[in-house]
C-alpha cells in the first residue's frame, strides 16, 4: 500500500493505492484567504495539520508502506525552525500582491546584465549555429528572457522578508514550497525535490544549485532553503514509515501520463492549465518564453521539460457558474456542443495572460447579439482556453520540432469532451485522456513505487478516450489571435 498526500490549490487529498488500484481517497478543503484583491493566502498551519492527520489515517487504517507527497508549486512558505510554526500565511501561486516588487527586482542591474548577456548569446548563435547545443550557451540564451514574475516563489519570499524587516533576526527562518513544508512537519527534515526547486525562480536548473545572484536580490541566503534530493530518495520517516515519492504536481502528471520520451506533450487542465513538453536529459532554452524546468530527477535518470501555463481554465469555468450562466459545470460540454454560433470569441484574461504573453490585458467577449445564448458564451469560453493551449503548443513545435502526433490530458477539466475535442481540432493532434483525472497523485504513487522496487518505468495510467482532429478551426483561431492582439492595445 502506498499513501499519497496531494496538496492542491483547492483541496488536500489522501489517495491510497494497492499496486495500481486506488482503494481509498479522502479530501479536505485548503483554507484560503483573500485579504485584498489579487492576494491569495493559504493557512499553512491548517495545511500541515491536515497532512499529518492524513498520514496517520494512511498508517492506522490502511497500513501503508510509504507516504508520498505531491503539491502545487511556487506557493511560498516561511516558518520558524525554533517552533516549527509558519511566520506568515503561505502565499499561493496565484497571489499577485508583489507585482510592483517584481518590477523593481527586474530593474536590478544583475537581471539587466544577465538579459544583455543572453541577447548577445542569441546573436552569436545566429552566426554560429553549432554553438546552440552547448549547455553554457543554452543557459545564456535562457537569461535573455530572465524575468522575475509575481507568481514565482522568489518574489513572494522577498515580500515576506521585507515585511519582517528587522524582526527576522528573532527567528531561525526556513523557507520553501509546500512539499518542503509538509516534509518538515512530517519528518523534521528541511528538504525538497528537484522538480519543486526548479519552479521557484531561485534555482539554476542548468547547474543544479540555488542561484546566488537571485538570492542576493531576494535578500535570502542558502542556509534558509532546503536541500534538494531525487524524488525517489528517502526524505525521512513519519512514525517509522518512509516518506518518498516527493514530486511537484505537473511533473507527477507528466510521469503518470507516460510522457517519458523527448517530444511527449501533456496538458493538465485543473484550476489553471499547464502544458509540458519532455525535452530529454539536457536542459533547453526557449526564446519564445517557455519555462525551462526539471521534470524529475530520480536516482537512475533525469528529465527536463519546457512549460507554458494558463492562470485560469477550470477556475474560469467555475466563474461562469458563479455568475449564473449554468448551475453545474458538468453541463458545459453538452451546452457548448448545442451552440451553433461560430462568431463569438472570448479572451480569457481574468488576472492577465501567462505564457507566452505575461501581460495584464482586459478580458473580452466579442460578437454579442440579441440572438446569443448561454450556450454560445460557454462555447466561446471553452474554445478560448483551447486556443490558449494551441498558442503554447505552437511555440513548442516551432522551437522543438519533435515528431509527435498527440497530447495527453488529465485534470478535472479534462472530463469535458467538447473542450478536449477543440484542443484536437485547433492543434491538429489527437488528444488522449487519462483514465485517472488526478494524474498528480497517481504519478507520485508511481515514483514512490519505483523507490520501493515495485515496478519499472514502463507502467503508466490507461487512457479512456481519444479525440481525433475533425474540424478545421484555423480561420477562427486566426481571428481569435487578432482579437487578442487588439486586447493588448486596448485602453478605455
From Swiss-Prot:
Keywords carried by this UniProt record? Kinase, Transferase
**An example molecular function term from Gene Ontology annotations:** phosphotransferase activity, alcohol group as acceptor
Q: Name one Pfam family in it.
A: FGGY_N
Nucleus keyword on record? no
InterPro entries per UniProt: ATPase_NBD (IPR043129), Carb_kinase_FGGY (IPR000577), Carb_kinase_FGGY_CS (IPR018483), FGGY_C (IPR018485), FGGY_N (IPR018484)
Q: Which Enzyme Commission numbers does its entry carry?
A: 2.7.1.-
Regarding protein family, the annotation reads: Belongs to the FGGY kinase family.
Q: Which protein is depicted?
A: Uncharacterized sugar kinase AF_0866
What is the organism lineage in this UniProt record? Archaea, Methanobacteriati, Methanobacteriota, Archaeoglobi, Archaeoglobales
